Amino acid sequence: MISAGDLRKGNTFELDGQVYTVVDFLHVKPGKGAAFVRTKLRNVLNGGLKETTFNPTEKFQEAVIERKEMQYLYTDGELYYFMDQQTFEQIPLNFEQVEGAIKFLKENMFAIIKFYKGEAFSVEAPNFVELQITHTDPGAKGNTATNVMKPATVETGAVVHVPLFINEGDSIRIDTRTGEYMERV
């Protein structure tokens, strides 16, 4: 059992016969009245979003989630195909199932696919990926101010804020959990 006060992003639990994963949460402690937890939940099976508030002492049954590493193969524009390395079985996933991770995945990279009762519902990118910059504005010569960032597009199409010294063609390491630049590779 998990209590509402212990909910965090990524937790998966059962509520009213459905399985939800926590997309966002906020613990609210008003000056008057009881504390509560405001959550944004995604239905694991149909992808629907639901915003709900809970009393922090409410308890839920945790859902058993299977995690399997699979290789991202390709997209046909509508579906994204992943392959199990042991059975060579390919599974197609739609954009709603891959949206958080796909902006950091290149073809042939490995990702964690989450399953509930044999049904794939979510993709988790590796914590760190190395991608090449395909477009960014050139940094001004001599501009060495610290913590000044500029937008850069990487080879997967994601936009990441990078320091001024990063140029097109450079490879960088990105933390996929936050979408932030880590270092030049």
Swiss-Prot record:
Positions of transmembrane segments: none
Gene: efp
NCBIfam families recorded: efp, PRK00529.1
InterPro entries per the UniProt record, alphabetical: Elong-fact-P_C (IPR015365), NA-bd_OB-fold (IPR012340), Rib_uL2_dom2 (IPR014722), Transl_elong_fac_P/YeiP (IPR020599), Transl_elong_KOW-like (IPR013185), Transl_elong_P/YeiP_cen (IPR001059), Transl_elong_P/YeiP_CS (IPR013852), Transl_elongation_fac_P (IPR011768)
The entry's keywords: Cytoplasm, Elongation factor, Protein biosynthesis
HAMAP family tied to this protein: EF_P
Keyword presence, Protein biosynthesis: yes
Subcellular location: Cytoplasm
Chief localisation class: cytoplasm
Signal sequence range: none
Name of the protein in question: Elongation factor P
GO biological process, one term: peptide biosynthetic process
Family: Belongs to the elongation factor P family.
Organism from which the protein derives: Clostridium tetani (strain Massachusetts / E88)
Pfam families found in the cross-reference section: EFP, EFP_N, Elong-fact-P_C
GO annotation, cellular component aspect: cytoplasm
